[in-house]
Amino acid sequence: NVYPAEIEGYINDMSGVAESALVGVPHPDFGEVGVAVVIAKPGATLQPDAITAALKASLANFKIPKRCFVVAELPRNTMGKVQKNLLRNQYAGLFTA
């Protein structure tokens, strides 16, 4: 099992990262894989490939997100909580198209 909070913790500790969310999306070969959605700190430039490469030094291969996206903001509900269900829906077709 992969625990999103563990991977998010590693990503959030990276230089230039303001916040991240990890969601599971369907994959034809693996059933489900992780996709990281990251917000950069103001003025920082993040490269998705650099984020996944940095994670390889700290995490087991099966825990590394298969894809990483840098976005301006994460969807939130009225309480301020990240709406991971919306992220799952947004990226659900990545590996099945």
Language model feature labels by segment:
Residues 1-63, 72-75, 80-89, 94:
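AMP-binding/adenylate-forming catalytic core of the ANL superfamily
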